Design a protein with these regions (language model features):
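Structural preference for beta-rich elements and adjacent junctions enriched in aromatics
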Residues: 1-229
Length: 229
């Protein structure tokens, strides 16, 4: 597989990982706090894989609206780049630059390159209309809503959810917890994974969040009112 990691601001604070395997499998993640990977993020990008007798190659298209970024200076943008190739049979990893996510400093060690400033906008509406039919009572129940995403440029993204369908994402892993503290569950809902890294902060050797978005939309512990976030 190959990994393409990009720090769009070049400041070592937030990076984005794009992974493509030889079997056309993909993965992506947000990188914060030097080496913390949040795989709940699903970015908008494209890829293609080609294989022949000489080997295999991959092509990746990452639109400029994929991630938020600061305004460029003097028409030039500084990017942080990290590229590597992993051979599964031997576990060998060839990387440029020489950096490792196992070290204390990883994201800030990306290679800095200068590219011209580009502007690319995005406006997307994802509607939904699920239905439910009760065979016992003979009743039907329908809902409707939409996710709206507007990015006129890299500095101003607007995300909205109208009657969000929180059942459209993958189910959580089953965890049996007999302790007093609740089990931490990451958020996979698209509305909350967009720019989620802005709520992360480092406290000693722990990664914490200012807002626990999984409680949004849920009831409080006593069943009265909304849950604390």
């Amino acid at each position: 597989r190959v990994n393409v990691m990009v720090d769009f601001n070049g400041d070592g604070r937030t990076g984005y990982d794009f992974v493509v395997s030889s079997t056309n499998g993909i993965n992506d993640a947000v990188i914060t706090n030097e080496s913390r990977f949040n795989k709940d993020w699903d970015g908008s990008w494209q890829h293609a894989v080609s294989e022949d007798a000489a080997g295999w190659s991959v092509e990746i298209l990452i639109p400029w609206y994929t991630a938020p970024m600061h305004a460029a200076k003097d028409g030039q943008r500084t990017l942080g780049i990290y590229l590597d190739r992993v051979t599964g049979s031997s576990g060998e990893r060839d990387a440029w630059p020489v950096a490792s996510f196992m070290r204390p400093r990883f994201l800030s060690e990306f290679q800095r390159i200068e590219v011209p400033q580009y502007h690319q906008s995005l406006f997307a509406i994802t509607p939904y209309a699920p239905g439910l039919y009760d065979n016992v009572r003979g009743r039907s129940h329908f809902q409707h809503g939409a996710d709206i995403l507007w990015k006129p440029n890299g500095q101003f993204p607007l995300t909205a959810a109208l009657n969000a369908d929180f059942g459209q994402v993958e189910s959580d892993d089953l965890v049996v917890n007999f302790g007093a503290p609740e089990t931490y569950v990451s958020d996979k809902r698209p509305f909350f994974t967009e720019n989620q890294g802005i709520f992360d902060f480092s406290l000693l050797d722990d990664n914490s969040q200012l807002v626990y978005t999984r409680r949004v939309g849920g009831p409080s512990d006593d069943g009265h009112g909304a849950a604390d976030i």
